[in-house]
Amino acid sequence: MNTLAEWVDLVCRELDIADAVSPAAMQSRVLDLSRDVAHNVARPAAPLTAYLLGLAAGRSTDPEATADRLAQQLCLLAQRWPDDQRESS
């Protein structure tokens, strides 16, 4: 197990959500979303967007499916973010 997987596993247990989430699916979903937001919008927007995704998914009766759907939606939104509004590097 690598450091990231160990950390995610520990955090899921600490937050008492280990039975409610698939760490592998969640990791891929959140990292893809974070990459798209950081690259296309602004680096600080990535963790904030991931947090907001978690809040929205947590309010759902099916958090995994909701997180998948919303992550895809937000990735597309970030990819369409206008060039002139992107943070300068």
Language model features: what each stretch is:
Residues 21, 27-60:
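Amphipathic, hydrophobic secondary-structure cores in small proteins
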Residues 1-28:
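An acidic intrinsically disordered interaction segment
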Residues 12, 65-89:
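C-terminal binding/interaction regions
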Residues 16-21, 60-67:
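Short, glycine- and charge-enriched coil/turn segments that flank and shape catalytic ligand pockets
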Residues 4, 30, 67-70:
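Hydrophobic packing residues in well-ordered alpha-helices of helical domains and bundles
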